[in-house]
């Protein structure tokens, strides 16, 4: 049986753990004990912080693992690469970690390689904030957090200090990046990279709440774009993945396309996409199991992806921003397109990040995007 080590075991990883077990892998979970809800899907579980790299490496050597991953947990990627490199397993390199670990590092790399990216300022103190010269509106965000945490759109200079304070609270390093605001449509791109060759699997339409926090509310595949736009997106993303040295891993790229047709890379994670995009939507829309592909990649059993199906698929999230989704979920029997759902009938809380949700449903259709 192929032995797979998974770093991290919190709730967002449950879908990936379930799939790994369903595929017949021997799963070894390594994570903090607190919040390790994925423990039930492990053949073995070690309550070790992924920050203890040498201890994680010791366990992985003892377990004679065939591959290691953190699925969509970006903060664990340095440990994944550390262990894989020490054991001669498939992974990205330490240089890739250095280039991708912060939004600022990515901006610098894109700029150096002629890849379209918003103008930006790294802010490490209030003094630097006060000295900054920027064209408004801007986006203020932590350099090193995800899930829409700490992100604020600022229209005028008078709002910059409050947005900075919010971003600093969510930043592990206390650093903030202030970026040019790019108005336009949002997309994500899911890909697998093997030995430096990139395989684009799907392009996703993203619907957010907009300003001020840009919370993700819906995702739909395939994106409603022209063939020319799709080719431009694929070409730009492949160039960006190469620049960031993403050579042996899944990736999740966020991009924006403005009204003039100009494409900008917002950020790239050298990991699976969350929000059911990689775990479910790619499979529902293309027939290709991205989780299976990512595990095969990590364990040295990669096969070139073969896309043989074409369907429409998507996810709607139930939150204070979209309360009517709760009624759709409750009446799911009236909607044959719905293939999976979950609902929590606790009172809705004010949505300030992607974590503030009370449910979701997934759909698959051969008759176009499911419109409510």
Language-model features: where?
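ATP-binding N-terminal substructure of ATP-dependent carboxylate-amine bond-forming enzymes
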Residues: 1-95, 302-303, 311, 320, ...
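Peripheral (often C-terminal) accessory segments that flank ATP-dependent C-N-forming ligase machineries
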Residues: 13, 112, 129, 293-372
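Short acidic/polar active-site loop segments enriched in Thr and Asp
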Residues: 66, 174, 242
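Active-site nucleotide/adenylate-binding loops and adjacent lid/helix of ATP-dependent enzymes
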Residues: 100-177, 183, 194-196, 223-235, ...
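Protein kinase-like catalytic core scaffold
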Residues: 138, 199, 264-267
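ATP-dependent carboxylate/phosphate-activation module, predominantly the ATP-grasp catalytic core
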Residues: 158, 180-246, 250, 257, ...
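Flexible, glycine/charged-enriched surface loops at secondary-structure junctions
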Residues: 177, 248-253, 304-309
